[in-house]
């Protein structure tokens, strides 16, 4: 049996509120929980997520450290092969 008066009050039907509307109920030590984001309006879960990384990671690395692009290394090899065929 838990000791009396040392545990917080438990609310089995606490309301989770997002943008002024109740989105779900859950158990909590507070009667109302106010949240900014939940799975119903988060871009990842709604399928409206935008991908910000349009360049490849290797290309960004090559540009950052002044090595050109990853494709330039392969194009140099292709040029050498063409020259050797002549």
Curated annotation (Swiss-Prot):
<comment type="subunit">
    <text>Part of the 50S ribosomal subunit.</text>
</comment>
<dbReference type="InterPro" id="IPR027491">
    <property type="entry name" value="Ribosomal_bL31_A"/>
</dbReference>
<keyword id="KW-0699">rRNA-binding</keyword>
<dbReference type="InterPro" id="IPR042105">
    <property type="entry name" value="Ribosomal_bL31_sf"/>
</dbReference>
<feature type="region of interest" description="Disordered">
    <location>
        <begin position="65"/>
        <end position="86"/>
    </location>
</feature>
<comment type="function">
    <text>Binds the 23S rRNA.</text>
</comment>
<keyword id="KW-0689">Ribosomal protein</keyword>
<dbReference type="GO" id="GO:0006412">
    <property type="term" value="P:translation"/>
</dbReference>
<dbReference type="Pfam" id="PF01197">
    <property type="entry name" value="Ribosomal_L31"/>
</dbReference>
<dbReference type="GO" id="GO:1990904">
    <property type="term" value="C:ribonucleoprotein complex"/>
</dbReference>
<keyword id="KW-0687">Ribonucleoprotein</keyword>
<dbReference type="GO" id="GO:0003735">
    <property type="term" value="F:structural constituent of ribosome"/>
</dbReference>
<feature type="compositionally biased region" description="Basic and acidic residues">
    <location>
        <begin position="76"/>
        <end position="86"/>
    </location>
</feature>
<dbReference type="GO" id="GO:0005840">
    <property type="term" value="C:ribosome"/>
</dbReference>
<dbReference type="GO" id="GO:0019843">
    <property type="term" value="F:rRNA binding"/>
</dbReference>
<dbReference type="InterPro" id="IPR034704">
    <property type="entry name" value="Ribosomal_bL28/bL31-like_sf"/>
</dbReference>
<dbReference type="InterPro" id="IPR002150">
    <property type="entry name" value="Ribosomal_bL31"/>
</dbReference>
<protein>
    <recommendedName>
        <fullName>Large ribosomal subunit protein bL31</fullName>
    </recommendedName>
</protein>
<keyword id="KW-0694">RNA-binding</keyword>
<comment type="similarity">
    <text>Belongs to the bacterial ribosomal protein bL31 family. Type A subfamily.</text>
</comment>
